[in-house]
Every structure is written in C-alpha cells, then in structure tokens.
Amino acid sequence: MAPKKAAPIAEPAVFAADAELDQAIDDLRGVLKKDGAADFGADFAAAGPLEQPMDFGSDFGSTDGAGFGGDFAAGFGGGLTETGAAGGFDAGSGFVGGDFDAAPIVGETAPGSGMTANMDLIMDIPIDVQIVLGTSRMQVSGLMALTEGATIALDRKIGEPVEIMVNGRVIGRGEITVLEGDVTRFGVKLLEIKGTKK
C-alpha cells in the first residue's frame, strides 16, 4: 500500500502580517535614503562663494615656508617660482568649472517634506493592542490539574480598570463596556492614557 501524500501546509496569517511589516520597513528605509541623498551638499552653498582663494598659509604664520625652517622651493629643485610652478591652485582660473553658488540644486525638496512622508509610512504600520483583564499566579501542578469547567481567579475585582498594552507595555487603563452598535461584543472605554516619559 502506497503512503498518502500530505497536503501542503498553508502559511498562517502571521507570516503574511510579518511580510507586510517588513515591506513597510523597507519602504521607510528607501524614503530615508532618498531623502538623505537629496539634502546632501545643500549646506555647502551657504558657506560662501569660492571666488576668494583660500589662505591656508596664514594659519601657519608665513606663506613662504620660513615658519617650517626655510625655503622649500630652493631645497627641492630651486627656482620653481621663476618657472611659474609655484602659482599652485588659482581659484579664479576656472579650474573648478565655475561658481558653486550659481549651480541650482536639482531635486531640492521643501523643508520637512521627507518627515511627513516618513510619518505617513510609520502611521500605516499595524500594531497589536492587548486588553489585560487580569492575571493569576499558580504552581505548575495547579496548571496541570486544570480541566474544562475550572475557574481561575484573577487578581482584579469586578469594576476595576483593565490595562491597555502595546508590545508588553502598559499605555493606559480603561473599563470594559458593551459596544453600542453590537451588544454581542465588548469594548474598552479609556479612563487614563499614560505619558511617554518614565
């Protein structure tokens, strides 16, 4: 007799939710990378025009090398100043291709537009909210002895507020109520929302 082939196991809905969360996070990373690349270099234009040559020699006291122990041109090939090689980099010679201030920044976005796009992505991420009616502490032997119809005593009394939790963290308290539009379902009326500060 041939063995029966089992039907393929379907992925639970949990994996689908994880895939949606991963996609939302990847989309957020893409927006952050794109947003960061658009702003790169925008602060360089505010530094001032590059038409004036930089004077690094004034930082060292002298531009002829005397502050470092002598004339370097004479020690290394001498007469370089006569051949024009000592001219170095002339910022006005057009070497850099023009003025950086004159070039418009392509793809400049309005300030804060990246933040609103990021917030839209974040606001679409689903989270699980749990309502904790109460807890109970028991020994393993008591847990193993439970049968159908057994009652477990909770640490809260009737009418006490329940805890509202997100990711294992209490974010508020509320009271259990019956939904107005559907008397077969429960809801929670918020009594207190905890602040983010600890």
From Swiss-Prot:
Gene Ontology MF terms: cytoskeletal motor activity
GO annotation, cellular component aspect: bacterial-type flagellum basal body; plasma membrane
Pfam (any one): FliMN_C
The keyword Cell membrane appears for this protein: yes
UniProt KW Ion transport keyword: no
Protein's name in the database: Flagellar motor switch protein FliN
Record-linked InterPro entries: FliN, FliN-like_C, FliN/MopA/SpaO, FliN_T3SS_HrcQb, SpoA-like_sf
Signal peptide: none
Main location: membrane
Subcellular location: Cell inner membrane; Bacterial flagellum basal body
Assigned protein family: Belongs to the FliN/MopA/SpaO family.
Role summary: FliN is one of three proteins (FliG, FliN, FliM) that form the rotor-mounted switch complex (C ring), located at the base of the basal body. This complex interacts with the CheY and CheZ chemotaxis proteins, in addition to contacting components of the motor that determine the direction of flagellar rotation.
Topological category with respect to the lipid bilayer: Peripheral membrane protein
Keyword terms of this UniProt record: Bacterial flagellum, Cell inner membrane, Cell membrane, Chemotaxis, Flagellar rotation, Membrane
Xref: SUPFAM superfamilies: Surface presentation of antigens (SPOA)
